[in-house]
Amino acid sequence: MRRVTRTIAAAGAAIACCITMTACSSPFGLPISGSVQTLAPVEQQAQRVYTNPQGPADDAQPETIVKGFYDAMPAGVQSDGYRVAREFLTGSASAGWNGDSAALVYSGTPDFRRRANTISAPQGAESSLIVEVELQVVGSLDSHGVYTPSNSTQTRRLPYTLMKKSGQWRISSLESGVVISTADFEQVFRQVSVYQVSTSGKQLIPDIRWLSWRNWRTQAVGEVLSDAPSWLEGVLRGAGLSTIKLAVDSVPVKNNVVEIHLNSGINALNEEERGLLVHRIRLTMGDGNAEYALRITGDGVDYSDADANVKLTTEQPTAGVYTLTGGHIVSLASSSPLRVGEAPGYDDARGFVFSSSGGAVLRADGVVECLKSDGASCGVMFSGEPMRSITEGLDGEVWAVSENGRELHVSDGGKETDLKLDWLGAADSIVALAVSPEGCRLALAVEGEDTNGVMMTGVARNGDKTLSGLSKAATQVSVLRHVTMLTFYNDLNLVYATTPPEGNSEQQEAWRQMAPGPANAQRLPNGTITSMASGQISLSRRLAIVDDLGIVRSVSGSLDGSWTIADSQVTALGAQ
């Protein structure tokens, strides 16, 4: 067999990568310390395309009426509050329909077909029939703006009952909620991070929602005051906000200042709780900007400065990228690769995490070996039990997936913790995992009978940020099968990829998304990718990959740019 040289690359801080047992040996190492940098909040779409739908034409056929309703729904979410969409409904149907209660997101072109209505037309109607719409649904939103992906290979049929009165067809019966195309989704829904406070009281968790552009501020305040989704239960600091509501169902902007008027419930909070609430609202309104200007009152009392002493920020630690090549540990953080340690004997390593304070390597036999800051061994972890993959956690943690894929193991400063996932099906197993930058979310690639795809669950922390447990629930963020590697590019965006059949790199898939949210295809360089990570390369934050020839490439910004080689000599540094 021809031997090829290759590298094992590693990325760091709270952003990690993992690979499966069968994947090639090119994992990234993850730094566990370093300076803190402020990441610019994700830029919200500034130039939206506003739609101007037309109402129903006289004598329009039933299919045309339903098509017109579909054309009008995006404007209802975005700007007109369903004024035009309701023109396609009968009066009683309009009164009972709530477009904001949910959303279905579809790809492709809907198919509109009529069929007979077996129920007699209601009194006063000249005729009645059903128009059935067949869709490729890729996801849905609930009333809180939480996104859940769907299997797009399965079609869904939505029935609309129409009646004819005075010679005109109108929709008389339909389910509440809207149906929006993937092309329109980000034009009509705004991504909003509802910032939650972890059980440690020292970390902020971005709880991603998708809210209608026309009144997103009002909805966002409501979500800050509402219960968190089930997958974060048990990992958030309780605040007792059930009695606090908006005094009026509106959040106006006056002289470029957002004004939020709450009822007297906020007065019952103590000073610390009130400060945290105001801070969470400020960060949520400002996309993570702690200096965002707003005015908050509670029953007429001005609390705009209540968070003046709250120090929680959305800043993330700088994440370096390291490679394990030919027995050397190399940092790619600066403009030129820098050798920082010696770790011989791991040419067939299957995983690697590292920082200036040390790390760990997943040996070819599955045993996780501790590394000192100079690369020297400091013993084995997890009692020498074989593991499937390892990844970096918070402040030096090493997370590992058991060989059977059923349990997680965490090493932190010599203390080891075993974790079980209550939501994992009996026939399911974990393939890979990544820990979010703040350390309070886990993304896991899962395969089995009950669950396939990428799941996300919460991580509970003590006051000193040490691990205390996991949420008992999880949320699905992708239904893509055979995911074997994943990493948080930043605190909002998750990137993941499959391992293709041997010798067929063209079948390898990679995706990125604000999680949970719609996924976008991630372009990969040529070759078969064996591992990925995120961190600082050549003085800027980048997504990095390593291919089956050991070449490390990286891309930055929107992740749609050109891939550049991070180290042109890696093919001579190690052997598989």
From Swiss-Prot:
It is a lipid-anchor. Residues 1-16 form the signal peptide. One of its GO terms (cellular component) is plasma membrane. This is Lipoprotein LpqB. Keywords: Cell membrane, Lipoprotein, Membrane, Palmitate, Signal. PROSITE patterns: PROKAR_LIPOPROTEIN. A lipid is attached at residue 17 (S-diacylglycerol cysteine). Belongs to the LpqB lipoprotein family. InterPro entries: Lipoprotein_LpqB, Lipoprotein_LpqB_C. It is found in: Cell membrane. A lipid is attached at residue 17 (N-palmitoyl cysteine).
